[in-house]
Swiss-Prot record:
The lineage of its organism: Bacteria, Thermotogati, Thermotogota, Thermotogae, Thermotogales. It is found in: Cytoplasm. Keywords: Cytoplasm, Elongation factor, Protein biosynthesis. GO terms for cellular component: cytoplasm. GO terms for molecular function: translation elongation factor activity. This is Elongation factor Ts. The gene is tsf. InterPro entries: EF-Ts_dimer_sf, Transl_elong_EFTs/EF1B, Transl_elong_EFTs/EF1B_dimer, Transl_elong_Ts_CS, UBA-like_sf. Belongs to the EF-Ts family. CDD domains: UBA_EF-Ts (cd14275). Associates with the EF-Tu.GDP complex and induces the exchange of GDP to GTP. It remains bound to the aminoacyl-tRNA.EF-Tu.GTP complex up to the GTP hydrolysis stage on the ribosome. Residues 81-84 are annotated as: Involved in Mg(2+) ion dislocation from EF-Tu.
């Protein structure tokens, strides 16, 4: 079956995938757009881990200011090409993640970003809280509490405020699968009026 350039272009606009990948997916799907999108997603999901090490020099910085003007967030989200950085889906996710930071107050982007001394301090606090428990279950309880800490303190581990069936990292991975590029939140800063001041 001959695949038209218009069909390839349409699939590329929908997915952000490369021209050759779009052509192959359409050929494999016999011109069926929905099947081609699914093929590209499966291929992208399988390669998301491979792309994690690739350089992300493009991207955007988004600013979100809560309607009352008392909370603001700057968030940097990166990708590999300016083509992906300009897509509405990329920009919308970055903006929604800035809202996530405003609402949920994470301290770190990923669990790997949490300093070892902070983790040890948290463990000490948890152990002190459960010092009367039998030794054989203390570590399990500590690990469970530490997991809850990561879910609150790390943006990627948080439940997404616009869809509580997903974590933020799931949304990042879905966009990696769709675009075929490494995508990551590099950093964010959250501001709140009066925060950090003592009289």
């Amino acid at each position: 079956m001959e695949i038209s350039m218009d069909l390839i272009k349409k699939l590329r606009e929908m997915t952000g995938a490369g021209i050759l990948d779009c052509k192959k997916a359409l050929e494999e799907a016999n011109g069926d757009m929905e099947k081609a999108v699914e093929i590209l997603r499966k291929k992208g999901a399988a390669t998301a881990e491979k792309k994690a090490g690739r350089t992300t020099k493009e991207g955007i910085i988004v600013a979100y200011v809560h309607f009352n003007g008392r909370i603001g967030v700057l968030l940097e989200m990166n990708c590999e090409t300016d083509f992906v950085a300009r897509t509405d889906e990329f920009k919308e996710l970055a903006y929604n993640l800035a809202k996530q930071v405003a609402a949920m107050k994470p301290l770190y982007v990923r669990r790997e970003d949490v300093p070892a001394e902070v983790i040890e301090k948290e463990k000490e606090i948890y152990r002190a809280q459960i010092k009367d428990k039998p030794e054989n279950i203390v570590e399990k309880i500590v690990e469970g509490k530490l997991e809850k800490f990561f879910e609150q303190a790390c943006l990627y581990e948080q439940t997404y405020i616009f869809d509580d069936t997903k974590k933020v990292k799931d949304l990042i991975n879905e966009l990696i699968a769709k675009t075929g590029e490494n995508i990551r939140v590099s950093r964010f800063t959250r501001y709140e009026i009066g925060e950090g001041y003592e009289d």
